[in-house]
Amino acid sequence: MDSSSLLPSQWSDLPLDILELISDRLDHDSSDTIHLLCLRSVCATWRLSLPLSNKNNRLSKFPKYLPFWSSSSSSSGFFTLKQSNVYKLEAPLNPRTCLVKLQETTPGIMRVLDLFSNDRICFLPENFPSKIDLQEFHVRLVRRTYRMEYANNGGGAVPCFWSLHSDKVVILSSGEDSAIIAIHSGGKLGFLKSGNDEKWKILDNSWNVIYEDIMLYKDNRCIVVDDKGKTVIYDVDFKVSDLAEGLVGGGGHKKHLVECSGGEVFLVDKYVKTVWCKSDISKSVVEFRVYNLKREEKRWEEVRDLGDVALFIGDDCSFSVQNPAGDLAGGFIFYSDYRNGGRSRGICSDGDGVFNVDMQGDFVFSIKPNYFGP
């Protein structure tokens, strides 16, 4: 046997062109800062050779300031496009899974956000590490999410009927073509293409259509659902196709789209009901119904058993996790619960709820399951 085969691999001696090839091989969906940090953590040579700047970042396709809904005039202010990512952290010697939502503020520096919203978590749990060694954790991107925030440049007042933010934003990309599609004031669907677009355009201006959720599907398409459950899909050229008719009777109060493993699409319909107790005091309860998309039949079919899948319903994005570790197994829906005076800001929120799909019941938990992250 050749003695050289017994020597450990000298990763630091890898030719620079090979290292650049490895970096370029990060596909568009997974190429974010965390994956670059994982590569850079191998050795000092790799850290020096791989910059933190990410040329595949979709935000780079658009200007720093986006036009406001109502006008291309800068006097109305601007939107800034923000990105955050949900990650699943797994340690080889620890069976528990941790979910964490991060926003990169400067290259390599992350801010921890509430899992169900975009609130910054200022006070982390005592057992949450101040630093995460990427050589000790397996990191998987669960969901990438975007939102737009209003930035006033000192101009005039903005009419109150215009929304100053949007948590329902996707970026479509195909080759050199990119576009932002967002749900804004009144549930309308607006888009802005990269390049020379200086004003938002409306995709569907029907007076009786109110869109409630939008979801990126396989990079260059997006799925949109309205308040009645009618669902359509757009491609990067804004060609639209019907996916499913609406729910019988229109369904509940709020629709959420979730993509599961294998490209399966779920519709989570949220009901908020008022019940009367013996004390004549009303109490609101939350109920969810879950539907699976039947594309060939163009309809939603109700699902009674989620198996080992848990669904997470957030303000800006929803996602699924298969067989999560911790105190609760699959078959549950976790969501933000605003019924009891709102949610805590700046700390681990104590207003989160969980719904058992099997038992059709909900409750609020004061301590998050172990796999939630901070």
UniProtKB/Swiss-Prot annotation:
Source taxon at top rank: Eukaryota
Residue ranges of domain F-box in the record: 9-61
InterPro entries hit by this protein: KIB1-4_b-propeller, SCF_F-box_domain
Entry-linked Pfam families: Beta-prop_KIB1-4
PANTHER family on file: DUF295 DOMAIN-CONTAINING PROTEIN, F-BOX PROTEIN SKIP23
Protein name: Putative F-box protein At5g60060
Organism (species): Arabidopsis thaliana
